[in-house]
């Protein structure tokens, strides 16, 4: 049963023409995703532990989320893939400068914000959506995505629960 194709196409007409759809997840099949199989991913969330010492870990790919490009540890590193939820301004100069400099793959989930949104012509946009939207945080959904792409290991930090962020202890935003 195809539970998501129509929504992907209505939200992301420019980057939903080559979807992989399973019972759990749907995503635009970018050629870059083939190189993930058997590799190690470092996934950085916005919680306070993202500011801890994680750089000593060995990894092949670096992923993050939302305002990652404002973090002191990430702003000069190449993040290979970032999922952007409803909050970030993707027309802001600091976002566009980072994205263009590092050629980061930028992913979006189905959300009202993106319906009828006029995306620019950046060629590394993709859509990804799981059946677990709204039940799990974005980091957990990114781990599901990583599993579907065949990563052998997923290391992560910055997923400290909502309490720290509600208290204002966020690694990506002051």
Predicted features and spans:
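Metal-ion/cofactor- or nucleotide/acyl-coenzyme-handling active-site neighborhoods
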Residues: 1-174
């Amino acid at each position: 049963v195809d539970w998501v194709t129509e929504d992907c196409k209505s939200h992301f007409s420019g980057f939903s023409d080559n979807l992989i759809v399973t019972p759990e997840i749907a995503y635009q099949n970018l050629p870059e995703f083939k190189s993930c199989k058997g590799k190690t991913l470092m996934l950085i969330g916005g919680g306070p532990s993202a500011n801890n010492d994680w750089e000593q870990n060995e990894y092949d790919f670096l992923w993050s989320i939302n305002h990652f490009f404002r973090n002191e540890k990430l702003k000069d590193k190449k993040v290979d893939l970032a999922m952007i939820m409803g909050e970030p301004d993707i027309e802001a100069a600091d976002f566009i400068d980072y994205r263009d400099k590092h050629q980061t793959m930028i992913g979006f989930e189905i959300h009202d914000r993106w319906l009828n949104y006029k995306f620019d012509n950046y060629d590394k946009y993709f859509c990804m959506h799981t059946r677990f939207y709204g039940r799990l945080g974005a980091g957990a959904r990114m781990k599901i995505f990583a599993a579907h792409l065949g990563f052998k290991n997923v290391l992560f930090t910055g997923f400290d629960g909502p309490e720290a962020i509600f208290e204002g202890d966020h690694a990506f935003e002051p």
